[in-house]
């Protein structure tokens, strides 16, 4: 049986991809890591890890059900943050202000329905609405702290969340390749 590495989520708008590129250029060579390619910037609602074809079919059924029960909504991107914390930053991300509760509820619904089908990722964490822009390898602490302080309250734009998708992730030496397996429009 074929296994695929996958997540449930959606791709962000071009404007957010451009913000990520601008931040990358601003801190060039002071924060080193794997920056997310503009075409790959996305919001993950649930990382599934390796799933079988049979599990993928169940996830698709769940997304179809969820899409019928939810209508499109807007989110606003605001501020930068890091995971797990500023003392050991591994991930640099753009946060969500307006619409964060709706995103959280959507992510919980995805996780709940998938769990009912026995699809429970190994590394399940509490959902924090964010868009990863860099996986940090090394950094200048002063630069990182200044960046976080500078952008703490900055609004970066907005998106309409109007669809959710099962997306496969193929890891390659040049970075992941994301492929939409199936997507559903909210309210459809």
Swiss-Prot record:
GO molecular function: 2',3'-cyclic-nucleotide 3'-phosphodiesterase activity; protein kinase A regulatory subunit binding; RNA 2',3'-cyclic 3'-phosphodiesterase activity
One term under GO cellular component: cytosol
Record key words, sorted: Hydrolase
SUPFAM superfamilies cross-referenced by the UniProt entry: LigT-like (SSF55144)
EC number in record: 3.1.4.58
Reaction catalyzed: a 3'-end 2',3'-cyclophospho-ribonucleotide-RNA + H2O = a 3'-end 2'-phospho-ribonucleotide-RNA + H(+)
Residue ranges of the motif HXTX 1: 42-45
InterPro entries on file: AKAP7_isoform_gamma, Cyclic_Pdiesterase, Phosphoesterase_HXTX, RNA_CPDase
Hydrolase found in the keyword field: yes
Motif HXTX 2, residue range(s) on this chain: 130-133
Enzyme class: hydrolase
Recorded family membership: Belongs to the 2H phosphoesterase superfamily. ThpR family.
Full protein name: RNA 2',3'-cyclic phosphodiesterase
Organism listed in the record: Aquifex aeolicus (strain VF5)
Taxonomic lineage: Bacteria, Pseudomonadati, Aquificota, Aquificia, Aquificales
């Amino acid at each position: 049986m074929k296994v695929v590495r996958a997540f449930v989520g959606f791709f962000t708008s071009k404007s957010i991809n451009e913000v990520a590129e601008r931040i990358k250029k601003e801190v060039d060579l002071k924060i080193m890591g794997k920056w997310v390619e503009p075409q790959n910037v996305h919001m993950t609602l649930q990382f599934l890890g390796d799933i079988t074809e049979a599990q993928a079919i169940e996830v698709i059924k769940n997304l179809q059900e969820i899409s019928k029960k939810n209508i499109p909504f807007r989110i606003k991107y605001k501020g930068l943050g890091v995971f797990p914390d500023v003392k050991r930053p591994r991930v640099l991300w753009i946060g969500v202000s307006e619409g964060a509760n709706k995103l959280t509820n959507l992510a919980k619904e995805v996780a709940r329905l998938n769990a009912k089908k026995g699809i429970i990722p190994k590394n399940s964490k509490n959902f924090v609405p964010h868009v990863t822009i860099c996986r940090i390898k090394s950094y200048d602490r002063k630069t990182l702290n200044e960046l976080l302080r500078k952008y703490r309250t900055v609004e970066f734009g907005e998106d309409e969340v109007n669809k959710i998708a099962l997306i496969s992730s193929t890891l390659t030496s040049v970075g992941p390749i994301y492929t939409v397996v199936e997507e559903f429009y909210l309210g459809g």
